Amino acid sequence: IGIQYQQGLADLCPASDLAEGLLNNVDRPPVTDPATGRILFENQALPHFNEVDECAGLDALVTNRLWRQLGLDPETTLHDVRYGEPYQLDGREEFVWVFQISGGAPPKHFIGGYAGAASYRQPPMYFPLGGGTLSGVSKPGEIVWSRIYVEDDRLKADLGRARALALPPEETRRRLSLTTPE
């Protein structure tokens, strides 16, 4: 699953990234049923995807369920691989990829959690009706990346491990400035 009409929807409604990022976080403000006042999906991360990317929703759902079964934090994040370049880290050269997405990223994944999160207005060229991002810098540490895709009319998956790095603030800003920083 992917939202095949994503670009068309951008002309019809504001970006939903901020709401999706909050819903994809276990610790979030309560959302109540207007009829009963009952808190909906309390202490649960609701996997979200807001991209046309093939199988993005399926990947988020499978990952969320797997993490819960393993007793791990169930929040998931969809990222685009923007670019990569060498960087000197601890006296040796590492190739550092920039993963970035405007929304659906839970504050749980950010340095400082909610304190490290910000929302920026989506650029008018992408979302004329507005809407906010949910932005932050990823916590350093081990990550698992995955993608699910269709090849030769069959569903396939790739999985891997990587490490999110703590870069100096000025390097983080420089890398953000090379893309759409919002």
Region locations from a protein language model:
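Anaerobic metallocofactor- and corrinoid-dependent redox/one-carbon enzyme cores
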Residues: 2-182
